[in-house]
Curated annotation (Swiss-Prot):
Region (Polar): 2-54
Annotated transmembrane regions: 52-72, 99-119
Protein location: Lipid droplet; Membrane
Major location category of this protein: other
Keyword Membrane: yes
Function: May have a structural role to stabilize the lipid body during desiccation of the seed by preventing coalescence of the oil. Probably interacts with both lipid and phospholipid moieties of lipid bodies. May also provide recognition signals for specific lipase anchorage in lipolysis during seedling growth.
Similarity remark: Belongs to the oleosin family.
Protein name in the entry: Oleosin 20.3 kDa
Record key words, sorted: Acetylation, Lipid droplet, Membrane, Transmembrane, Transmembrane helix
Pfam family, one: Oleosin
One GO location term (cellular component): monolayer-surrounded lipid storage body
Lineage, highest ranks first: Eukaryota, Viridiplantae, Streptophyta, Embryophyta, Tracheophyta
Modified residues (N-acetylalanine): 2
Length: 191
């Protein structure tokens, strides 16, 4: 009987079509998983539709933001160069000069923000095309989890603060009661 069971185990059919078996003879990279290794045919596959759409949407947006950043920076530097001599010449009229310098500094900060936004946009597009970043739904799920954690933390802190205030109020009542009952020559309230 034991030999029959052993023979059954030896002849088990393992050709289940639902399980992916690695194909080592395939010419699609390492292990047949579509890697881009030594035997890759990456050039014949081409980019996916999502990658093309991301490139079409991301490059103009990133380029526009970088252009805006450059123009804003140039305008801010010119404004700053004009405002410094004006400030020195017309120092009695300090309010317009301060306003000019404030606008120049605001322009420089706006330029930096445009540049940072443009670079992060281009970086995201490149990471998306390389496949190294999470997908948008995964990023949204992560953001939702972070928001839920923050709300939970704020709720916990609110409860702790409420308990703290309640304890302090109880402490103050006890201290007041102890002060009233132990003062010499005074009777307790309510008697």
């Amino acid at each position: 009987m034991a030999n029959v069971d052993r023979d059954r185990r030896v002849h088990v059919d393992r050709t289940d079509k639902r399980v992916h078996q690695p194909n080592y003879e395939d010419d699609v990279g390492f292990g047949g998983y579509g890697g881009y290794g030594a035997g890759s045919d990456y050039k014949s596959r081409g980019p996916s539709t999502n990658q093309i759409l991301a490139l079409i949407a991301g490059v103009p947006i990133g380029g526009t933001l970088l252009t805006l950043a450059g123009l804003t920076l140039a305008g801010s530097v010119i404004g700053l160069l004009v405002s410094i001599p004006l400030f020195l010449l017309f120092s009695p009229v300090i309010v317009p000069a301060a306003l000019t310098i404030g606008l120049a500094v605001t322009g420089i900060l706006a330029s930096g923000l445009f540049g940072l936004t443009g670079l992060s946009s281009v970086s995201w597009v490149l990471n998306y095309l390389r496949g190294t970043s999470d997908t948008v739904p995964e990023q949204l799920d992560y953001a939702k989890r972070r928001m839920a954690d923050a709300v939970g933390y704020a709720g916990m802190k609110g409860k702790e603060m409420g308990q703290y205030v309640q304890d302090k109020a109880h402490e103050a009542r006890e201290t007041e009661f102890m002060t009233e009952t132990h003062e010499p020559g005074k009777a307790r309230r309510g008697s």
